[in-house]
A protein has these predicted regions:
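Short hydrophobic/aromatic beta-strand or adjacent loop that forms the aromatic wall/cage
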Residues: 14-16, 99-104
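Conserved active-site alpha-helix within GNAT-family acetyltransferase domains
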Residues: 75-92, 97-100
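Short, well-ordered alpha-helices that flank and scaffold nucleotide-derived cofactor binding pockets
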Residues: 58-62, 85
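Conserved acetyl-CoA pyrophosphate-binding loop and the N-cap/start of the following alpha-helix
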Residues: 47, 51-59
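Residue-level recognition of conserved beta-strand positions in structured domain cores
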Residues: 40-42, 72, 106
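Active-site acidic-Proline motif in GNAT/NAT acetyltransferases
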Residues: 44-46, 50, 74-75
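Acetyl-CoA-dependent GNAT
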Residues: 1-46, 94
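Conserved GNAT acetyl-CoA-binding A-motif
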Residues: 64-75
């Protein structure tokens, strides 16, 4: 079962949440800002395609209790499938400077 551990250090270089499966760190979520924009989600390579990203996003949705937004590269089909499975829907990219990205939003 995936759990999120909140990192209270709170600087921009440190992940806001670490993702654990049992006692093993398997990834992190970086910077969920005041508007609900998620800067980056990473599941370590050896733990991909096992459903952990989906479980981590569901845990984050349950914690945050608000709309969440992110940008994903258009060619990152694996991440796109994960976001769609948990209820994110495509929209315009949140940061216009990211031309090869598509925005995703989850409405709480």
């Amino acid at each position: 079962m995936v759990k999120l551990w909140y990192n209270c250090q709170g600087d921009a270089e440190t992940p806001e949440y670490y993702i654990y499966n049992d006692r093993t760190r398997i990834g992190w979520i970086k910077n969920v800002d005041e508007d609900g924009y998620i800067d980056e989600i990473l599941i370590y390579n050896s733990y991909r395609n096992m459903g952990y990203g989906k479980e981590a996003l569901i845990a984050l949705m349950n914690l945050e209790k608000r709309d969440l937004k992110l940008d994903v590269k258009v060619d990152n089909e694996q991440a796109m499938r994960c976001y769609l499975k948990v209820g994110f829907v495509p929209c315009e990219a949140w940061h216009q400077s990211k031309r090869d990205y598509i925005g995703m939003i989850w409405k709480n």
